[in-house]
Amino acid sequence: MFLTRSEYDRGVNTFSPEGRLFQVEYAIEGHKLGSTAIGIQTSEGVCLAVEKRITSPLMEPSSIEKIVEIDAHIGCAMSGLIADAKTLIDKARVETQNHWFTYNETMTVESVTQAVSNLALQFGEEDADPGAMSRPFGVALLFGGVDEKGPQLFHMDPSGTFVQCDARAIGSASEGAQSSLQEVYHKSTTLKEAIKSSLIILKQVMEEKLNATNIELATVQPGQNFHMFTKEELEEVIKDI
């Protein structure tokens, strides 16, 4: 006799008769409550743009980090439970440094994503990695960087599944943003056009008026390190949209 749905809910490693892991599905839905993030890959580099939700005028906007540097050639944008993201970010940073010390070369964007994916898959295991949790991570990540294959963009969801993308949106307005990306993206898109498109789409889906304090923007280009836009640089870019 099959258990009820609520009883399948309690076990993170138990499949339902329909072949579903409800806790993983809930985590995937949970990350959609986070702020919207957009990543676009071009031949000139990768851009990451994220909405920052300032819930109180007493909050310091600069203390909210939605885009972080993994290594000099890789950045990461997040949406969902930021505390969960910190664990995955730490894992990615440790992996890139260990790879450098061991092989004297930078780690590829795909390998970094794979390492983080392996940790995300270890939920509920007794002998798992020390960073693993007893439940799925409630966060989706966009890894953007440049390696020997050129500019790369990877999306990883809470199930640990990752896939390479030309352009991707995650977060609360991801469906509308993804539709807009499909309309504006083409293989010949320049980095400047990608930056402009990502901000225009964020402007369309954000509830508040877009300004230099409620978004974050970063780029990674061949031959150049990860670059996070300053408030002054953001104001210049926003003037053009």
Curated annotation (Swiss-Prot):
Keyword Oxidoreductase: no
UniProt keyword annotations, A-Z: Acetylation, Cytoplasm, Glycoprotein, Nucleus, Phosphoprotein, Proteasome
Protein's cellular compartments: Cytoplasm; Nucleus
Example of a GO cellular component annotation carried by this entry: proteasome core complex
Major subcellular location class: cytoplasm
Residues carrying sugar: S198
SUPFAM superfamilies to which the protein is assigned, alphabetical: N-terminal nucleophile aminohydrolases (Ntn hydrolases) (SSF56235)
Gene Ontology biological process terms, A to Z: proteasome-mediated ubiquitin-dependent protein catabolic process
PANTHER family noted in UniProt: PROTEASOME SUBUNIT ALPHA/BETA (PTHR11599)
Gene (name only): Psma5
Protein name (record): Proteasome subunit alpha type-5
PTM-bearing positions, type Phosphothreonine: T55
Coiled coil (residue ranges): none
Positions bearing Phosphoserine: S16, S56, S63
Leader sequence residues: none
Family: Belongs to the peptidase T1A family.
Keyword Ion transport: no
Subunit and partners: The 26S proteasome consists of a 20S proteasome core and two 19S regulatory subunits. The 20S proteasome core is a barrel-shaped complex made of 28 subunits that are arranged in four stacked rings. The two outer rings are each formed by seven alpha subunits, and the two inner rings are formed by seven beta subunits. The proteolytic activity is exerted by three beta-subunits PSMB5, PSMB6 and PSMB7. PSMA5 interacts directly with the PSMG1-PSMG2 heterodimer which promotes 20S proteasome assembly.
Lineage: superkingdom: Eukaryota
Higher taxonomy: Eukaryota, Metazoa, Chordata, Craniata, Vertebrata
A Pfam cross-reference name: Proteasome_A_N
Biological role: Component of the 20S core proteasome complex involved in the proteolytic degradation of most intracellular proteins. This complex plays numerous essential roles within the cell by associating with different regulatory particles. Associated with two 19S regulatory particles, forms the 26S proteasome and thus participates in the ATP-dependent degradation of ubiquitinated proteins.
